[in-house]
């Protein structure tokens, strides 16, 4: 009923604007002035064959050269598809930042499993460069890590290449972290005040609080506990913090690692918004802000082949790292402003993890799409596989030119397992609020079991039967090709 009334109010507001042309013209002028005033800049590949210091044995593609030119102008999200050459792009960009003195010590953050390959490619492209690549075994243990960090801090490196695991263990100065958390506490208290909550300084939930205020107070309590734990932590003598390393440019590969942004929202009833705090994302944001303070908002670069995997919140999170000033210009520096400008919630009936159905509300409709794309492309350099000349010749074609869908019947055994999962979910639903909080992991566990059961019942329990109808067996049948027998 409430959602229907909300829709009626929105429709009445739109009708009022349409019936009063002078108001419509005034609002259109405000919107175009504040939100629709960007033209996507075109970047040209420089007319050089090789960058200064780079080997002549490697030729960069035009989109890589354009990416370097763009990165030298502003912080950028490189949404480049897998295999399009982000390694050479990041290496060249880091070396050019160093050459033109836009950065003194650029750092590239890569996956630990690929750091040796990345470092080898970087040294191949720039044979005479002073490149420090810290593999995982060089930073295992506190003493090894301290030695490695001292090497970064004391060396005059052209490039520093770090694995994600090591980078995540480098702490910021506790004084900076405390100040950063305090800023977040102030924002949350202001949000409680704007929602009409009494005693915004307190994290204690009042019976008169609205659902939104209750959720904000829970976030406030968590942040206060984090700040207190930081203050109670004993001082580490001789500790080397991120601020001591001299790094003044960050180039983060596989940026989806940091997409679980640590942000708060008043849209607590919207499904699909991952509002849970990620220590990695919180830590990354602190380091990003430190570098932006040193460089006037520059020198932050992210690369990922999957910038959006779940929700539009990921677009906002990536832009919050790289282009916070652009979000401010659009008036969407807070997530709720972004969501209200570019999305619309939709209430639908959806299956639960047990196969039953419930009504949920999600951000599924987009609005002001042209302006949103303009904002995104102002911050992001997007390259698809088909944008790379000759890519189609390197990739095998699909059979019949499209994916093949294989539909399987549910086995009787799978039906029994799913019914058992449903029963356990119904039992959890009947628990009291306190019991649910103590067993909050149950829905996620059941969801995982249901996903595994759909693939093969033995993934739920090894003693379950090997059913011919399972997806794993169907995959084997579809892919297995018997080796030709010699006569």
Regions found by a protein language model. Name each.
Residues 82, 89-120, 128-129, 294-298:
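Conserved SF1/SF2 helicase motif Ia
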Residues 113-140, 151-153, 322-326:
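Conserved helix-turn-beta segment of the N-terminal RecA-like "Helicase ATP-binding" lobe
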Residues 145-192, 204, 211, 218-249, ...:
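Inter-lobe coupling linker of SF2 helicases/translocases
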Residues 253-254:
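Walker B catalytic acidic pair
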């Amino acid at each position: 009923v409430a959602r229907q009334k909300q829709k009626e109010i929105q429709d009445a507001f739109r009708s009022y604007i349409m019936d009063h042309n002078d108001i419509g013209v005034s609002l259109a002028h405000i919107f175009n002035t504040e939100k629709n005033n960007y033209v996507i800049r075109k970047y040209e590949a420089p007319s050089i064959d090789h960058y200064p210091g780079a080997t002549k044995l490697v030729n960069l593609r035009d989109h890589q050269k354009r990416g370097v030119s763009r990165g030298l102008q502003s912080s950028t999200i490189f949404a480049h598809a897998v295999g399009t050459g982000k390694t050479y792009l990041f290496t060249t960009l880091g070396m050019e930042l160093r050459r033109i003195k836009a950065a003194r010590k650029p750092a590239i953050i890569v996956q630990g499993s690929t750091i040796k390959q990345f470092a080898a490619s970087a040294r191949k492209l720039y044979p005479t460069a002073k490149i420090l690549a810290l593999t995982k075994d060089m930073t295992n243990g506190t003493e090894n890590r301290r030695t490695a960090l001292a090497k970064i801090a004391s060396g005059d490196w052209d490039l520093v290449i770090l694995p994600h695991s090591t980078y995540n263990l480098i702490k910021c100065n506790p004084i900076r972290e405390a100040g950063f958390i305090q800023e977040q506490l102030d924002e949350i208290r202001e949000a409680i005040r704007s929602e009409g909550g009494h005693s915004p300084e307190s994290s204690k939930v009042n019976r008169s609080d609205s659902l939104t205020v209750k959720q904000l107070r829970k976030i406030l309590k968590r942040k206060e506990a984090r700040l207190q734990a930081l203050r109670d932590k004993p001082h580490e003598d001789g500790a080397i913090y991120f601020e001591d390393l001299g790094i003044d440019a960050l180039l983060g590969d596989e940026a989806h690692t940091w997409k679980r942004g640590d942000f708060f929202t008043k849209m607590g009833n919207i499904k699909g918004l991952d509002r849970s705090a990620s220590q990695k994302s919180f830590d990354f944001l602190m380091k990003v802000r430190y570098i932006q303070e040193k460089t006037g908002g520059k020198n932050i670069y992210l690369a990922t082949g999957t910038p959006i995997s779940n929700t539009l919140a990921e677009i906002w999170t990536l832009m919050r790292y790289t282009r916070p000033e652009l979000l401010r210009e659009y008036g969407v520096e807070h997530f709720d402003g972004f969501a209200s400008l570019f999305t619309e919630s939709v209430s639908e009936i959806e299956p639960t993890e047990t196969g039953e159905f419930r009504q949920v509300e999600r951000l599924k409709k987009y609005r002001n799409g042209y302006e949103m794309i303009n904002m995104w492309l102002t911050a992001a350099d997007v390259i698809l596989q088909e944008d790379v000349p000759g890519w189609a010749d390197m990739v095998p074609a699909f059979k019949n030119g499209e994916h093949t869908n294989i539909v399987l019947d549910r086995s009787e055994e799978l039906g029994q397992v799913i019914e058992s999962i449903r029963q356990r979910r119904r039992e959890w639903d009947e628990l009291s609020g306190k019991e649910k909080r103590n067993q909050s992991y149950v829905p996620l566990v059941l969801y995982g079991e249901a996903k595994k059961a759909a693939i093969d019942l033995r993934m739920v329990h090894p003693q379950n039967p090997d059913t011919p109808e399972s997806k794993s067996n169907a995959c084997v049948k579809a892919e297995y090709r018997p080796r030709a027998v010699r006569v």
